[in-house]
């Protein structure tokens, strides 16, 4: 399993978090990986043409960029006066509602379980809304559940970091395809045979 760049790579538990996220993305996160959100070009230009491995790498990077703004990469973080827990600040009742393995505050402070739960949530909301962070009268996609995505400055910070990653590069050549011989022959006044 190739380990993609993540924004949390400077943290001691980063490799375990990345592996947990990749495992979840290959299992219950498959609907997330299959979806090409309508706003993906602003986040990761190469995503739409990328293979599943590249798409999973994007989501790991996305989770790590979101964790910067949710918990400053602290798996044991508790916010909202004891309401939200872990790397991605998940409410235990939300975790239970989505069928996550981690359903208590204590369990959600396990980095891998928190990420697995976040992927379970996003695997429902991103395909449902076909979006990462779109506001068409109400917030859609990941932004429906995670507040940092409602901040233009935080979205810009996350998207800028993600666009700089190798897994977000466009992998197909922008060079135009050659025209079929039959079209070139017709254009020069001769009929193709």
PLM feature segments, named:
Residues 8, 53-57, 82, 109:
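Short, solvent-exposed segments of well-ordered alpha helices
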Residues 39-48, 54-74, 118:
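Short, functionally critical alpha-helical segments immediately adjacent to catalytic or ligand/cofactor-binding
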Residues 61, 89-93, 117:
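Generic alpha-helical secondary structure signal
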Residues 68-73, 93-97, 121-124:
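Amphipathic alpha-helical interaction surfaces
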């Amino acid at each position: 399993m190739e380990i993609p760049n993540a924004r949390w790579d400077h943290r001691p538990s980063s490799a375990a978090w990345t592996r947990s996220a990749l495992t979840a993305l290959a299992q219950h996160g498959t609907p997330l990986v299959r979806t090409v959100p309508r706003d993906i070009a602003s986040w990761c230009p190469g995503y739409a043409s990328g293979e599943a491995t590249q798409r999973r790498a994007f989501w790991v990077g996305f989770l790590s960029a979101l964790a910067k703004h949710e918990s400053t990469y602290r798996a044991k973080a508790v916010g909202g006066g004891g309401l939200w827990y872990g790397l991605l600040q998940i409410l235990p009742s939300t975790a239970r509602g989505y069928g996550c393995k981690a359903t208590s505050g204590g369990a959600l402070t396990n980095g891998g379980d928190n990420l697995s739960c976040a992927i379970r949530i996003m695997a429902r909301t991103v395909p449902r809304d076909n979006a990462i962070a779109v506001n068409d009268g109400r917030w859609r996609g990941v932004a429906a559940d995670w507040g940092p995505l409602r901040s233009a400055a935080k979205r810009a910070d996350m998207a800028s970091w993600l666009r700089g990653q190798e897994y977000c590069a466009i992998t197909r050549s922008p060079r135009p395809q050659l025209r079929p011989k039959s079209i070139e022959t017709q254009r020069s006044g001769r009929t193709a045979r």
